[in-house]
Amino acid sequence: MSLSSRLCLLTIVALILPSRGQTPKKPTSIFTADQTSATTRDNVPDPDQTSPGVQTTPLIWTREEATGSQTAAQTETQQLTKMATSNPVSDPGPHTSSKKGTPAVSRIEPLSPSKNFMPPSYIEHPLDSNENNPFYYDDTTLRKRGLLVAAVLFITGIIILTSGKCRQLSQFCLNRHR
């Protein structure tokens, strides 16, 4: 069996085998919601603590809850900046402009979204409707397959390039000795 046929066979086996009946046991998300800053509808118990037969519903955010957590983060940031500006030793006071008509520079930085805030568009949808769909793949599976294909193509390209040069080099060496 030649090297290229072995590589093709390995590629086909590597792409087909992982997709046969393997589903993630517990879907995980890249983004996690901070339970202390987000408003939830109910206290949902941890799935590990409930009985294995009972399925819990996923946390679904509405626009009101998302904006509510944003306003909570804004008020928390405002309270922190008030506490920081109340210290007379470290705060020299607001900067006033020497030119007339120019407003004073504010020391409060614009509010950026917190690290733990998850916008509603990133929430994973329940897998119930997609479980029976054979063409459905989650992001982690697609990422792994993409990396596998890229690695195989990269190695194949290196083999093709080096084998061609080695062939040319060996012919060059054989012709030189004649």
UniProtKB/Swiss-Prot annotation:
Residue ranges that the UniProt entry lists as topological domain Extracellular: 22-145
Post-translational modification: Glycosylated.
A single Gene Ontology CC term: plasma membrane
UniProt keyword list: Cell membrane, Glycoprotein, Ion transport, Membrane, Potassium, Potassium transport, Signal, Sodium, Sodium transport, Sodium/potassium transport, Transmembrane, Transmembrane helix, Transport
GO molecular function, one term: ion channel regulator activity
Family to which this protein belongs: Belongs to the FXYD family.
Subunit structure: Regulatory subunit of the sodium/potassium-transporting ATPase which is composed of a catalytic alpha subunit, a non-catalytic beta subunit and an additional regulatory subunit. The regulatory subunit, a member of the FXYD protein family, modulates the enzymatic activity in a tissue- and isoform-specific way by changing affinities of the Na+/K+-ATPase toward Na(+), K(+) or ATP.
PANTHER family the UniProt entry points to: FXYD DOMAIN-CONTAINING ION TRANSPORT REGULATOR 5, SODIUM/POTASSIUM-TRANSPORTING ATPASE SUBUNIT GAMMA
Described function: Associates with and regulates the activity of the sodium/potassium-transporting ATPase (NKA) which catalyzes the hydrolysis of ATP coupled with the exchange of Na(+) and K(+) ions across the plasma membrane. May increase NKA activity by increasing the apparent affinity for Na(+). Involved in down-regulation of E-cadherin which results in reduced cell adhesion. Promotes metastasis.
Name recorded for this polypeptide: FXYD domain-containing ion transport regulator 5
